[in-house]
């Protein structure tokens, strides 16, 4: 299952640190019900997912990778495959029928969650597990000019098309516990091989197997290697080796649908479309529009002087120990709109989708290299329209209704509106095929569409408070630049 979009980049881990800021940064894909406190019910209630299967609102996450200067005083986030201006990079989640009897596999039960790997591991355990052989790396060269074997750690050579990190989860369940104190003990790897084989008697229930792949664009740093030949990368928990790669999973499936797919979708093509159980899928644009705003006020991307949190880089082979320091609080999520209620009596409706072949707002149109939210509202108001939509930084569309109601803003979907306005880079003016929409209150009640994240503070929908505005200013620029198998 290719998850083309990223739901969230945040110091968040509701399995290990529920209700708290996590120790290190994670990249999250999956259902929008995700938050600092995440339950199965909240995941199932997700309005969208950055992954394509509509019956799957699970959450999948892994640590963020950074480039590190040789003197250890500078860090930069490494983009994932597919990442670019206004577009987030995702991951691939494989669902595989493995084991001695693939016809007798069980879907993840409601409320199930697990963790694989150990963020503090810094050497090779040699185990058929994670940490161990279930964690691996592939140096990508699509030209075929170079060929390297899989490694258990991050290699000390450049990969022409990036580095792929891989993790295989345990597939044997004790049949009782949906989680455990260490979030691992309720699960076990098969006997003999981490990705196949019979389950031990202690964990007799063979579940469907899942396997994560994340491609990091390490090739973008090919000319910034360390002078001694060492690779210059570090995971967000301070892991310079790669042995500490880890991953989390919170089930958000319609369990009956997953079980039906496990039983019936045996086509070896790996194409989701070849599994009729799933029916209609989310499009790539819908996956990209499914995002969550940051709720911890700290910089996670760009040029950093240290890794977020207390994560000094370590090379091992000693087991790393967790560090503690001052941690910012969870606050209200960053909001990506300008409060126009007091000034002109227009409310923010949300982020609508748009299509060049079938416009969402079909009234007036103007564009300007000095475009701002105020500029667009003034134009549409002057032309007699009650809706003003900003797109692609410098465009303004007007209307009195949405030509396509399916494209109208959904208050539960944040959307792909991240682009700084051409005339004021502290404001958001939509995005690619995405409209930041404002509506005239016409003297009536006014209320901005404020986006909420599970486990965060609420924010007044009409105040547009200054703290949210300041956070938006600090974070807006990072957003602007910035194989499923059932066999």
Model segments located where?
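Residue-level preference for alpha-helix termini and adjacent loops
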Residues: 14-15, 111, 171, 360, ...
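Serine/threonine-rich, low-complexity intrinsically disordered segments
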Residues: 137, 458-461
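N-terminal, immediately post-signal peptide pro-regions of secreted/luminal proteins
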Residues: 463-469
């Amino acid at each position: 299952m290719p998850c083309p979009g990223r739901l969230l980049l945040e110091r968040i881990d509701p399995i290990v640190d529920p209700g708290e800021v996590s120790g290190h940064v994670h990249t999250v894909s999956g259902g929008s019900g995700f938050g600092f406190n995440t339950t199965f019910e909240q995941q199932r209630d997700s309005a969208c997912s950055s992954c394509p299967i509509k019956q799957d609102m699970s959450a999948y996450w892994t640590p963020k990778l950074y480039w590190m200067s040789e003197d250890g005083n500078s860090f930069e986030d490494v983009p994932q495959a597919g990442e670019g201006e206004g577009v987030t990079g995702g991951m691939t989640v494989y669902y595989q029928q493995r084991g001695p009897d693939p016809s007798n596999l069980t879907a993840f039960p409601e409320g199930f969650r697990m963790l694989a790997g150990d963020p503090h591991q810094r050497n090779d355990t040699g185990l058929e597990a994670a940490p161990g052989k279930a964690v691996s790396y592939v140096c990508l060269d699509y030209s075929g000019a170079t060929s390297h074997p899989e490694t258990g750690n991050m290699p000390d050579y450049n990969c022409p098309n990036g580095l792929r990190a891989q993790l295989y989860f345990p597939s044997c369940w004790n049949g009782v516990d949906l989680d455990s104190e260490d979030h691992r003990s309720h699960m076990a790897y098969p006997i003999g091989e981490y990705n196949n084989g019979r389950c031990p008697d202690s964990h007799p229930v063979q579940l469907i197997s899942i396997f994560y792949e994340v491609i990091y664009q390490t090739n973008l740093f090919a000319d910034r290697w360390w002078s001694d030949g060492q690779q210059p990368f570090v995971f967000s928990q301070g892991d310079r080796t790669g042995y500490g790669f880890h991953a989390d999973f919170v089930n958000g499936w319609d369990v009956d649908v997953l079980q039906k797919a496990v039983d019936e979708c045996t086509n070896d093509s790996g194409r989701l479309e070849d599994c009729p159980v799933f029916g209609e899928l989310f499009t790539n644009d819908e996956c990209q529009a499914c995002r969550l705003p940051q709720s911890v006020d700290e910089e996670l991307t760009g040029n950093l002087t240290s890794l977020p949190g207390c994560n000094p880089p370590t090379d091992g082979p000693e087991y790393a120990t967790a560090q503690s320091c001052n941690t910012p609080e969870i606050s209200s999520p960053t909001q990506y709109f300008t409060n126009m209620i007091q000034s002109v009596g227009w409310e923010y409706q949300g982020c609508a989708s748009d299509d060049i072949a079938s416009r969402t707002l079909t009234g007036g149109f103007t564009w300007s290299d000095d475009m701002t939210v105020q500029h667009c509202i003034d134009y549409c108001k002057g032309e007699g329209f009650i809706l003003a939509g900003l797109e692609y930084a410098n465009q303004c569309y007007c209307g009195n209704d949405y030509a396509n109601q399916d494209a109208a803003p959904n208050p539960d979907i944040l959307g792909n509106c991240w682009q700084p306005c051409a005339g004021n880079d502290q404001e958001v003016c939509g995005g690619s095929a995405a409209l930041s929409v404002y509506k005239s209150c016409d003297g009536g009640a006014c209320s901005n569409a404020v986006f909420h994240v599970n486990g965060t503070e609420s924010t007044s929908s009409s105040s547009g408070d200054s703290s949210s505005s300041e956070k938006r200013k600090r974070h807006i620029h990072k957003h602007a630049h910035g194989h499923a198998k059932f066999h």
